[in-house]
């Protein structure tokens, strides 16, 4: 009987953990596919917590062989982005660090991330995160943009 209770508890905990995980990040509208040579992103970080987001984004995109360049957060509006060689602009807006405890650790944030297609100038992702771990968000973001790469 104790074994059955432990197994039932393990299944309930597994479902509880799985239900707390966020789904994939979806693109808004249609976006033209890219080839491997266009795997370049330009990133603008809001100065507060930029180090954490930079580290996680470089890891998530670096593993997938994306080239990453940075631009100052306040320079985005003044720069002619059409002349840049990157394909996408990722803007990590001001993030609020959450005091959230989890079994796995991690740093949790709430805020907004926008992604623009620099070929068209259109916003393709507007992701409002709420108490999510930064590495999970950057990994899902890399997967969403990686889905546009043709083989």
Residue spans for each PLM region:
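Bacterial N-terminal signal peptides that target proteins for export
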Residues: 1-8
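A structural "domain/chain start" motif
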Residues: 3, 18-70
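Residues embedded in well-ordered secondary-structure elements
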Residues: 9, 32, 102-104
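Bacterial N-terminal signal peptides
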Residues: 10-18
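Solvent-exposed, acidic/flexible segments
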Residues: 50-54, 104-106, 130-138
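Surface-exposed short loop/turn segments
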Residues: 63-64, 73-131
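Short secondary-structure boundary motifs at beta->alpha junctions and helix caps
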Residues: 117-151
């Amino acid at each position: 009987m104790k074994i059955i209770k432990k197994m039932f508890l393990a299944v309930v905990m597994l479902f509880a953990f799985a239900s707390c995980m966020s789904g994939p990040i979806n693109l808004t509208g249609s976006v033209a596919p890219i080839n491997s040579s266009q795997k370049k992103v330009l990133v603008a970080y809001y100065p507060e917590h930029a180090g954490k987001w930079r580290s996680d984004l470089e890891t998530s995109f670096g593993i997938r062989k994306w080239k990453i360049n940075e631009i100052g957060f306040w320079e985005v509006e003044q720069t002619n982005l059409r002349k840049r060689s990157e394909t996408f602009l990722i803007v990590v807006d001001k993030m609020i660090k959450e005091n959230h405890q989890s079994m796995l650790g991690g740093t949790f944030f709430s805020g907004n991330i926008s992604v623009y297609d620099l070929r068209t100038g259109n916003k393709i992702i507007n992701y409002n995160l709420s108490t999510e771990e930064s590495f999970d968000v950057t990994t899902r973001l890399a997967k969403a943009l990686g889905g546009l790469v043709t083989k």
